[in-house]
Amino acid sequence: MKSDNTRPTFNKPRRYTRLIFQQGRPPIDADFNEAHEIQLQMLRSYAADLIGDQGAVGGAFEITPERGAEEGGTHPVKDLTIGTGRYYVDGMQCENGADAVKLSTQPFGGPTADDLLQKPITVPALVYLDVWEHHRTWIEDDVLRDPALGGSDTGTRSRTVWEVRLLSKDKWTADEKKNFAKKGFAWKEALESRDGANHGKLRVRFNAGAHGGGDCDVDADARYRGVENQLYRVEIHRAGMALPSSADPDDPKDPDKKKFLDERAHAATFKWSRENGSVAARWVKARDCDPADGTVLRIEGPRDEVHGFSAGDWIEITEEVDDLRRHGWYFCADQTRRGRCAYA
């Protein structure tokens, strides 16, 4: 969740049951957030123990094929209708509150009608429900800003979202193709094994530099010289090569750096933030820019100079629809001083 927090402290193996505030101690966001996480974990565990790892209320999320006109002696599946109601996955409640929701019109993602026209549903296919939490800030929901505080935002929100997904047979493994018709085939485990690549670990180290001053002295070459708490966030977009630790990034003649630049088509794509990715602003249409120039971006002004965007910074451009549909992200360099990025 890309919110401005000090740190996440909830740890399920510790089995804490509540948080106890003490007199004379400063309240911090990490304590409040952990208290909510403890109660949420207990509630979902309770629901999973009673219901099981999955279960529906009535015909909730029942899948009904929508077939088209006969073609070659068969009626191809054009779309899928998703039943109304509540469904539980590992204790997480997801709700479809609308009638006649289809695979192509579900609220939180999925293929569009054009996608299904270009690539029709082939039978057999695996249809499954994916459920996760989606973080929202005032940028996605302006109601989260408090008018009494001059429009400042306070807490962010998290909501449960869902998506009915299709896995066509041509994407199944050999074992899945062989055993899919067997009763009790472990589809859940098969799907979870596909996400193994997303559960990697990151090893980081701190470069103290050559500065030999006292604990209160700050290296003049340090990029960050503040004293406030920092929660670093790193996101890997594409796996690949990284600049070797032996290379000098500031030396254009460094052989390791030169080799890396020569092969950067295979380089990893990632981003990092000292503020847990919470430095964000709305991007809006530039009315006063040349319509023929598609490289000019207009964004709302940052909340302050420290947490704003500086010339030379890389900016990620995305929107909520892309996030939910897991589409690609776009990056551009903030070249404000050269007129390529303007503030509204």
Language-model features and meaning:
Residues M1-A344:
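Subunit-assembly interface segments of extracellular/virion macromolecular structures
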